Design a protein with these regions (language model features):
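Pepsin/retropepsin-fold aspartyl endopeptidases
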Residues: 1-271
């Protein structure tokens, strides 16, 4: 896949993306415990039966889209190792299945930067889903935030719980859990009640959760995070998230600059 020059890739230190088409005639195994990715061609790994897997649902592209069970409902999801976290819940799927999800918080803003830059601000919900079943392995109390995208994603965190094998040639998906039994995922994620991203050649508040909606505004300039000046910080999501993640405990502060005045604002992590 050839894409135009993009600072997103430069910040990551990578030159591009390998899509599913690169593995169209292969079987790819992700094994986090061994810290390896194995590509088999053209044969399946030994002792792996076609009947042990489930079908890939995308008939036209080499995308790892499969059916999982969300409560008592079938849900198409894309397994994507490029997506952080466990569940990235699309707003459309949430709206369709809202009666089985518990909303714990509301927000407004931009969820994240992508290869095409920042999206538009949207309404966001923080939710907890009672159960997701992936090939017989049940994950309970699964937390996520809603995201405007084409479909729900199961992200790279799935690899913490089992080996994933994708047979692109025979269009089969396998999940082999490391342990038996249900896994409690801990509910809605604990996130800072504001998010900060590079925008308009500075750092701005780009997501506001309910507890902060009367304290800060979308687009407020942030010049300091918990004692770390952003003056020389690289204009990247990774850089600012590294600073946020380094804040000890569940409380901290930011300094915003508005109308040439600086103001210290307390922030905290919330579910």
């Amino acid at each position: 896949m050839v894409l135009p020059k993009n600072p997103f890739f430069t910040d990551l230190g990578v030159v591009g993306i390998l899509g599913g088409d690169a593995f169209a005639q292969s079987v790819v195994t992700f094994d986090s415990r061994s810290k390896i990715m194995v590509i088999n061609y053209p044969y399946r790994p030994e002792k792996l039966k076609v009947t042990d897997g489930i079908p890939l649902l995308d008939e036209t592209e080499h995308h790892s889209i499969v059916n999982v069970r969300l409560g008592n409902n079938d849900l198409k999801v894309l397994f994507d190792t490029g997506a952080g976290g466990f569940l990235l819940y699309s707003t459309e799927d949430y709206n369709r299945l809202a009666d089985i999800s518990q909303v714990t918080n509301h927000g407004y803003g931009i969820v994240a930067a992508g290869i095409t830059g920042l999206g538009k601000p949207v309404d966001i919900k923080k939710v907890s889903v009672p159960s997701i079943n992936i090939m017989g392995k049940e994950f309970t109390n699964v937390g996520s935030t809603t995201t405007v995208m084409n479909g729900t994603i199961i992200g790279v965190d799935l690899l913490q719980y089992g080996k994933v094998i994708i047979d692109y040639m025979r269009r089969r998906f396998y999940f082999l859990p490391f342990e038996e039994g249900k896994i409690d995922m801990g509910g809605a994620p604990a996130l800072w009640n504001v998010s900060i991203l590079p925008r308009n050649e500075r750092f701005e508040i780009t997501t506001i959760w309910d507890s902060m909606k009367d304290t800060v505004a979308f687009g407020d300039e942030v010049i300091n995070i918990n004692g770390t000046s952003l003056k020389d910080c690289p204009m990247s999501q990774m850089a600012v998230e590294e600073i946020m993640n380094a804040i000890p405990g569940d409380t901290g502060y930011i300094i915003i600059k508005k109308d040439n005045q600086e103001k210290r604002i307390e922030i905290r992590k919330e579910k």
